[in-house]
UniProtKB/Swiss-Prot annotation:
This is Ribosomal RNA small subunit methyltransferase J. It comes from Chromohalobacter salexigens (strain ATCC BAA-138 / DSM 3043 / CIP 106854 / NCIMB 13768 / 1H11). InterPro entries: 16SrRNA_methylTrfase_J, SAM-dependent_MTases_sf. Keywords: Cytoplasm, Methyltransferase, rRNA processing, S-adenosyl-L-methionine, Transferase. Transmembrane segments: none annotated.
Length: 256
């Protein structure tokens, strides 16, 4: 739904052309959601009462920095689900990258991660955030383990993986679901994703594609009480306080 957002200002003219986004000059933008360059980096914003604060991808500060320093290492739920353990650091594709939070955690723990995002505006935020992380001394090594690609994983996962020359042992999925978090901030952020991407009605197709591509396992993040994605039953489940991971295992990940 690239027409739902407009890239604003001369600095984004080339980016808009490359990603197929609408573009308008500064001062002319009338779209509900605007992509614009700010001193803090690329930002996606709309009417604050509806969408909340501007959305950026920043791996160098804030929650990402805190989680990098104090997040709990390989004991974190996403790390356990993806099979990171002593002597085991799999190659991972995050096929529903979003703002890259889970992928950054996995890269922080040493994994090589390909992030795939289908929404052009969100991909642009990821590209910008990763570029700034690459230029920061504290995060450059982590950023070097992350690559970002734009595409619809439900339809072209195999070709995207081949194009980026990665043989993923693990595919991580976090399909859109009705968000029950009581935080108004989270609710407003999710409005942006829903307005741009809609619900993931093709989650069963996405799971099927992931199972075809992953050599060892597929992990699917779900609300704790939500049913699994329609299709094959998961082999294992890991539960957290508000979410869980459904694990579809082809074979075990073993220490190198």
């Amino acid at each position: 739904m690239s027409d739902a957002v407009v890239a604003v200002g001369e600095p984004l003219r080339d980016l808009a052309a490359r990603l197929g986004l609408a573009w308008q000059a500064e001062g002319d933008a009338t779209a509900a959601l605007r992509l614009a360059m700010t001193p803090e980096g690329l930002a996606l914003s709309g009417e604050a009462r509806h969408y909340g604060a501007p959305i950026r991808v920043d791996f160098t500060a804030g929650k990402a920095a805190h989680r990098r320093r104090f997040g709990g290492g390989r004991g974190q739920l996403v790390a356990k689900a993806c099979g990171l353990a002593r002597g085991v650091t799999p190659s991972i594709v995050d096929a529903t990258a979003g703002l890259g939070r889970d992928a950054f955690v996995l890269a922080t723990l040493g994994a090589e991660v390909l992030l795939i995002e289908r929404v052009a505006a969100i991909y642009a935020l990821l590209e910008d955030g990763l570029g700034r992380a690459s230029a920061n001394a504290e995060t450059a090594e982590i950023a070097a383990r992350m690559r970002v690609a734009q595409g619809d994983a439900a339809r072209e996962l195999a070709s995207l993986v081949a194009r980026h020359d990665i043989a993923p042992q693990v595919v991580h999925l976090d399909p859109m679901f009705p968000h029950r978090d009581k935080s108004a901030l989270v609710k407003k952020e999710m409005r942006v994703f829903r307005d741009l991407a809609g619900d993931d009605d093709d989650a069963p197709r996405l799971l099927e594609a992931a199972l075809d591509v992953a050599s060892h396992r597929v992990v699917v993040k779900r609300p704790r009480r939500a049913p699994p994605i329609e299709g094959p039953a998961p082999h294992h489940m890991l539960e957290g306080k508000t979410s869980r991971y459904d694990l579809y295992v082809h074979r075990s990940l073993k220490p190198e």
